[in-house]
Amino acid sequence: PRQFDDIEDITYPVIVKTYGAAGGKGYFYARDKADFKKKIKAFKSEQYVIQEYIIGVTLYVHYFYSPITNEIEVLSMDRRYETNVDSLGRIPLHGQQGLDINPSYVVVGNQPLILRESLLPEAFAMGERVVETSKKLMGGKGLFGPFCLEMVITPDQRMFVIEISGRIVAGTSL
């Protein structure tokens, strides 16, 4: 997704995230510039990323890359269950109007997810591109061992990486 360095460039909904793992805390959604300016005043982090908010299904793909065999494996996939954003999604828009509830993204659990077969080649290719790019950026072996691509899949089945974790994230049963 597009990232914004200047709030004046914000033209559509964004999510603002602190750096580092925070268990789903340290996020807020803003509809536009005015909403951002209002919410940033209460935000507790001085360092943050402003990222285009992509509407779709979240997916966490856990990979393992071995520089010895030069092979990448998909170990598992899952989806986070977050309060209160997941329960808000079950309330029709007209039922949300007038509620003074800001979405929160505190992780309460993960559910295994089986990705549609037609999307598997792209999921593998994305992992391979991350490894190849890391080799160019870091030299030598680049990224190796476990890592996770945190993605959003849109209704037209486009896959966007929203974060890269250099580890297996909490949702796997490995």
Stretches found by the model and what they are:
Residues 1-31:
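A conserved helix-loop-beta module that forms one wall/lid of the active-site cleft
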Residues 56-58, 67-72, 154-159:
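Coil-to-beta-strand transition motifs
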